[in-house]
Amino acid sequence: GASFHHNLLAHHTNRCPRLNGARYGWGGSSADNYASSIEAEQVDLRNNVMYNWGKGNGAYAGMGGYHNIVNNYYKYGPATKNKDRVFQCGHTSGASGEVIPKNTYGHFYIDGNYVRDKGENYDWKGVIIDDGNTTVRDTIKLKEPVNPGVVTTHSAQKTFEKVLAYAGASYKRDAVDARY
């Protein structure tokens, strides 16, 4: 799996995190079928600050994979159209070339996210399903998070403070920087 944490994503319309889900000859959704990272994506999207995400949403897609969306801070900006959208859950369309079955959704653990003017734990209120099929909402929710590996987890509010304090290029130069 992969962990994407403590990042500042700002002023993007088409570059918000896209969770790819399952790929490469996917064999179906079962407990035995996800032993290989080639079979299913496992992603931990945690402690990020999303700002001014344009016409889309904080992240999207995720077909067939297992994902955490935890303690992120969403602050809309002047170009943000959907001001309360945490995630847009995709599903496969069955188009030619897709390797996973039609109408395959991902599985998501969504918890502790903050959306400006909506407050703490906005979470599933900020999720839309691509095809509007709200009947799948309970089947795609994970009760427990995917193992994120070793990562320090902060509240969404603390994430906002820490990411703004440390994101971007620093002026401090160490010995490696000084050689250039």
Annotate each PLM feature:
Residues G1-L19, R23-G54, Y66-P78, Y109-R116:
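Right-handed parallel beta-helix
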Residues V70, Y74-Y180:
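Long, contiguous C-terminal flanking segments immediately downstream of a protein's structured core
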Residues G1, R15-R23, G28-I38, G56-M63, ...:
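Glycine-rich beta-solenoid repeat tracts in large extracellular/virion proteins
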